[in-house]
Amino acid sequence: MSSKKKQNYLFSEPETTVAQSIILVIARIVFGFMFMSHGITKWIIFKDMTETFPDPIGLGPTLSFWLVILAEILCSFGFILGALFRLSLIPMIFTMCVALLFVHGGDPLTKIEPAISYLTIFVLMFFTGPGDFSIDVIMRRMK
C-alpha cells in the first residue's frame, strides 16, 4: 500500500530537471507573450471588432470577443507565470480549437498555422506542467 498522497492532476506537477525547467520557462515566456500580443491587439481595436467578431458557438459577437480577450491576455499571464497553470491553459486550448475548427476551418494551411502551433504547444504544456520555475511549484513547496 502506497503512503503517497493522491494528488489532483490539474494541480500536481511532475518532477523536472533544471534543464527541462529552463526550457519550459523559456517556452512559457515566448509563447505566452506571443499569444498575449494577439489579445492586446484585439483589445486596442475593440470598438471596431465587437460587432463583426466571429461567433461560432452562438454566444454573440461581443461576449465571444470578451472571452477570447480574457483567454489571450489574462490566461496568458497565468501561463507565463506558471500560476494556476493548467487551469489557465484550458481556455487557451479551447480558444485555439474553436479558431482552428470553426473560424478558420476551411482556410489554407498558411492561415491556420498559428492556431495549430499554439494548440500544439498548449496541449504539450498541459501534460508536461510548467516546470520548477513557476508560481504553482513555488507555492506547493512552501506548504
Over which residues does each language-model region extend?
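Perimembrane loop-to-helix junctions flanking transmembrane segments
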Residues: 50-61
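Membrane-interface helix-loop junction between the first two transmembrane segments
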Residues: 43-51
